[in-house]
């Protein structure tokens, strides 16, 4: 079934356009892809052929590698390349190893065949992608003669697919789970072969429960004893029916609403599905706020997706120590009134301004000015200031304080080089206890996801700066940052070994500033949250970019970057950025 726009389709398209193809898939139906950049970029479901009579070792191994790209009939064609005693014992579902096939083809002799290639990543049995770094695949296929035909006696653990095949014939599906407070939905991204990426597969992933380590901060709305009892069906107008066990009829209205929101958003990625209805033991299940036919759509549960409604963010900049707004058209800098704006001096100027998804109204006779948060010029004080006021308050102190962020609950977060490194100020202005283990590394930049559960981190150890994703939780009155997973990008298409800044573009996409080598120019890249896809967003100028801020959106990109020489550029489309201001020392965005 066709999926709605997949951002990896865009990433894959750009990578192919920039680097060319290392191999060509055989044939198959095409799927709709994402956006203007990917109008011609569509996922291909490979239709492989079994081995021909008398096929050489090279043809058998090449055919097997291609056949592993198709999961149809439990990899029936791929099994036909194996010896008869191995074909039924091979478990292709154990894992998926993705390798770089560029200039790395199988090597054979008159009786052997082996493949040596860099490993890009692996997909586990639940469909989660795990990027790798500095790993090499070394596999001997154990060629054997069977009834006069060459066959493979030593298949890999799971399947092997090239990076190009992964980008072209696998699909990305977000599976949604609830926060512990049941007020937001957070996507867990999985990857499946396109032929197997259907609503039933998505529901199986959802009903399997919250995977580790997300189970520490998320939960499912599916109560114990309630199960999906069969396969889904989609009618001619796009209504999918989800069959639940009879016990679902015992759920309270609030439980039904939470369950419907989780299922509906999980199925929202399929283009053929417009609305969802549920049955309990074969009878129609009534839902709060449902239409007369008891169908619901994702729009009904939009409040569970924590993305701002605005289509155009407000850009805030600092020029010559003064805070101000940048007009939507650009080139017009409106200095704010008050101590950190028009009245700013060298003693009260700021080094950083906090971004937020909250709306920050302009001061007017009927409205007081917005409350802003910033870091002092010496990076030792976290400040709060109401626009138009002459008073500046210090919320916390530290050393080398990072650009702060205001979260949806009005709390403020930043990092310091001192202990405790994580600083969180509650909405009431009090400093909260924090618990974090960085494993001896330092945070050099961070960005909290719109769901306020995931945190993207630029982590430094020695001269190395890399990307990591951690989880935020609140336990016994303290804020915990835990389960930090490294996201290596050195094996990706863009080969990024040095990351300097990061911002969330959506719930599943990041923009990072990075470069491949120390002497390179730092430019923006769009990255899938699990590291499964990456593409350049264009080299903007000959000067490296110093900062990136963004307002997360469900689709599209609202990002602003600041160069090392003070040029502010706003993302327009594809690889286009528009210069909007010069002489800028700091930047932030708000809804």
From Swiss-Prot:
Transmembrane segments: none annotated. Residues 1-20 form the signal peptide. It is a lipid-anchor. A lipid is attached at residue 21 (N-palmitoyl cysteine). GO terms for cellular component: plasma membrane. A lipid is attached at residue 21 (S-diacylglycerol cysteine). Keywords: Cell membrane, Lipoprotein, Membrane, Palmitate, Signal. The keyword RNA-binding does not apply. It is found in: Cell membrane. Belongs to the LpqB lipoprotein family. This is Lipoprotein LpqB. The lineage of its organism: Bacteria, Bacillati, Actinomycetota, Actinomycetes, Propionibacteriales.
